[in-house]
Amino acid sequence: MKFFIVLLAALALFTPAFGKTFTRCSLAKEVYALGVPKSELPQWTCIAEHGSSYRTNVVGPTNSNGSNDYGIFQINNYYWCQPANGRFSYNECKLSCNDLLTDNISNSVKCARKIKSQQGWTAWSTWKYCSGSLPSINDCF
């Protein structure tokens, strides 16, 4: 019996975090609750849909410059967050990239809004899928 309890405890400690998967509407509601205007919700849901499939724990494949993109909005670690491996980053959002991989998306939203204010929607490579038609969020509220 002790072995079984120890085994369960060990599995609980070493089980990888799977992150949260939002739906279009659950993401729209959460982002709105974090202060994003309703008029921007279609853009944010589109970026999340095409960048991470609405998943919080996604680390994208390595880019041509050796960087990676993190979290639900696929935020780049060369410019915006500090990677755990200590590699150089401008870290404009002043946070660890791991902070963008949690179920609490407040850091992701704050950083993404900073990116948008400095570079616009085209900062996201997935914007090409959004610029012509955006998902409706009318049925979400």
Swiss-Prot record:
**Keyword set, alphabetical order:** Antimicrobial, Disulfide bond, Glycoprotein, Secreted, Signal
Q: Which domain of life is it from?
A: Eukaryota
Q: What's the protein called, per UniProt? A: Inactive lysozyme 1A
Q: What does this protein do?
A: Shows antibacterial activity against Gram-positive bacterium M.luteus but shows no activity against Gram-negative bacterium E.coli. Likely to play a role in the eradication of ingested pathogens during their passage through the intestine.
Q: Which GO terms describe its cellular component?
A: extracellular region
Query: Any idea where this protein resides?
Result: Secreted
> PROSITE patterns per the record?
GLYCOSYL_HYDROL_F22_1, GLYCOSYL_HYDROL_F22_2
Q: Which cysteines are joined by disulfide bonds?
A: 25-140, 46-130, 81-97, 93-111
Secreted as UniProt keyword: yes
Q: In which tissues is it expressed?
A: Expressed only in the midgut where it is restricted to the first half in all larval stages. Expression initiates at the base of the caeca, proceeds throughout the first half of the midgut and gradually stops at the middle of the midgut.
The molecular function terms in GO held by this entry are: lysozyme activity
UniProt signal peptide: 1-19
Enumerate the PANTHER family for this protein: GEO02684P1-RELATED, LYSOZYME C
User: Domain named C-type lysozyme: which ranges?
Assistant: 20-141
| InterPro entries, sorted | Glyco_hydro_22, Glyco_hydro_22_CS, Glyco_hydro_22_lys, Lysozyme-like_dom_sf
Q: Which residues are glycosylated?
A: 65, 104
Q: Of which family is this protein a member? A: Belongs to the glycosyl hydrolase 22 family.
